[in-house]
Amino acid sequence: MKNGFTITQRNAVVEQHLWCIDTVMVQHAAWMQAAPIDPDDVYQSLAVRLIRAVNSYDPCKGYLKEYILSQLKREMVRVRSTQA
């Protein structure tokens, strides 16, 4: 971990930013309705990416929220590309 969070701190940060997953899913709601994909699978992929984003976050490179949202959007692109 670049940020020095303990596991407990990391988990708390992840819980505080779960709303980011919902935000990204709402932004891609039209695609999710049109694609044959289970929203629970998408949520799980985004949740794993959220944990990884918090683990790899470097405070010297910007705000945590922006980093998390960019990582979740990248994960959504990856999920979409696997459905093509």
Question: How would you label these PLM feature ranges?
Answer:
Residues M1-A84:
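Alpha-helical promoter-recognition and RNA polymerase-docking modules of transcription initiation factors
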